């Protein structure tokens, strides 16, 4: 058995917290393994003044980390699953996920509790086309402006009046200890579907690395692993980029069946379609693909 692991991750406060959560899981099963964090600055971290869809999408948060994996400079990588494209290099595999945190989005605003309450022509900071699509559906009068940066910097921009409100993932706020109920308000799934895989911490390794696979098999949270399959299959089939508004939310109906709500829009957010699919866990991937095909056809009509 190996005695040390090099774990690659982004150098942001949230990424480091999430990596330590993975290390805690590893230590539960392999207390004698030494885990060394290797912080990696990614292209997505360096370019903050442009929306992701103009500079290569969320894959920019993975590119340098995955290259370090391929070059064997690290042994495994930790990601927010919502940042992982539907298709990754064939030499790599998402081999484990931790238990999913509440995947809902949060409306962050000092003076109002919901998007509907905002005064006319207020400014919401968000660079996600998914969130923009929902905002435009609820309040077409609002202005959505580019809003990049880590959670702390976005909240600081809000506090200084750069925008009237923003929308962030609850999971990140909770892990950072930054969820403040005075100005953080959960958005229900019926009002805004989360991003694919939102709330899930993922572990990526090389396909043929049996030592890492053994570790990942132990820390993998199987119920979450099954839950995200239809969401990931939907994303992979669409081969979508950051210009395509996509939302998904999966939940167990019982021990054997999963319900997934899907949202898909065209790039300019002028048309959005919704669909709900119920599948057995054994066929949940097929359910995601079926939904993608059906919704693509609906958008073309």
Curated annotation (Swiss-Prot):
Q: What is its EC class? A: transferase
Tell me its EC number(s), please.
2.5.1.61
The record's keywords, sorted A to Z, are: Porphyrin biosynthesis, Transferase
- Which pathway or pathways does this protein act in? Porphyrin-containing compound metabolism; protoporphyrin-IX biosynthesis; coproporphyrinogen-III from 5-aminolevulinate: step 2/4
* Statement: the UniProt record of this protein carries the keyword Transit peptide: no
Q: What is one process in the GO biological process aspect for this record?
A: protoporphyrinogen IX biosynthetic process
Cofactor annotation: dipyrromethane
What does the record give as the reaction this protein catalyses? 4 porphobilinogen + H2O = hydroxymethylbilane + 4 NH4(+)
Q: Which GO terms describe its molecular function?
A: hydroxymethylbilane synthase activity
The note on cofactor binding and number reads: Binds 1 dipyrromethane group covalently.
Q: Which InterPro entries match?
A: HemC, Porphobilin_deaminase_cofac_BS, Porphobilin_deaminase_N, Porphobilinogen_deaminase_C, Porphobilinogen_deaminase_C_sf
Cite the record's note on assembly.
Monomer.
In the record, the note on similarity to other proteins reads:
Belongs to the HMBS family.
Family matches, as PANTHER family = PORPHOBILINOGEN DEAMINASE (PTHR11557:SF0)
Tell me the function of this protein: Tetrapolymerization of the monopyrrole PBG into the hydroxymethylbilane pre-uroporphyrinogen in several discrete steps.
Q: What is this protein called?
A: Porphobilinogen deaminase
Organism of provenance: Rickettsia akari (strain Hartford)
């Amino acid at each position: 058995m190996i005695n040390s692991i090099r774990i690659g991750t982004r150098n942001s406060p949230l990424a480091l917290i999430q990596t330590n959560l993975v290390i805690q899981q590893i230590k539960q099963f392999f207390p004698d393994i030494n885990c060394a964090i290797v912080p990696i600055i990614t292209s997505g971290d360096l370019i903050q003044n442009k929306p992701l869809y103009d500079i290569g999408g969320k894959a920019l948060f993975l590119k340098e980390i995955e290259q370090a994996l391929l070059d064997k400079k690290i042994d495994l990588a930790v990601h927010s699953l919502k940042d992982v494209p539907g298709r990754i290099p064939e030499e790599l595999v998402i081999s484990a996920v931790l238990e999913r945190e509440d995947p809902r989005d949060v409306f962050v605003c000092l003076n109002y509790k919901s998007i509907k309450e905002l005064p006319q022509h207020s400014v919401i900071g968000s660079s996600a086309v998914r969130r923009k699509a929902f905002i435009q559906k609820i309040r077409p009068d609002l202005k959505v402006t580019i809003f990049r940066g880590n959670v702390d910097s976005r909240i600081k921009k809000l506090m200084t009046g750069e925008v009237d409100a923003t929308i962030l993932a609850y999971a990140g706020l909770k892990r950072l200890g930054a969820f403040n109920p005075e100005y953080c308000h959960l958005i229900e799934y019926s009002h805004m579907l989360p991003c694919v895989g939102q709330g899930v911490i993922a572990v990526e390794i090389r396909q043929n690395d049996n030592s890492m696979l053994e570790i990942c098999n132990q820390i993998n949270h199987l119920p979450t692993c099954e839950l995200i399959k239809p969401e990931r299959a939907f994303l992979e089939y669409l081969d979508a980029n950051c210009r395509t508004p996509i939302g998904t939310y999966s939940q167990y109906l019982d021990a054997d069946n999963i319900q997934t709500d899907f949202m898909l829009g065209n790039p300019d957010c002028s048309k959005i379609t919704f669909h709900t699919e119920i599948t057995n866990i054994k066929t949940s991937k097929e359910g995601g693909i079926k939904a993608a095909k059906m919704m693509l056809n609906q958008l073309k009509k």
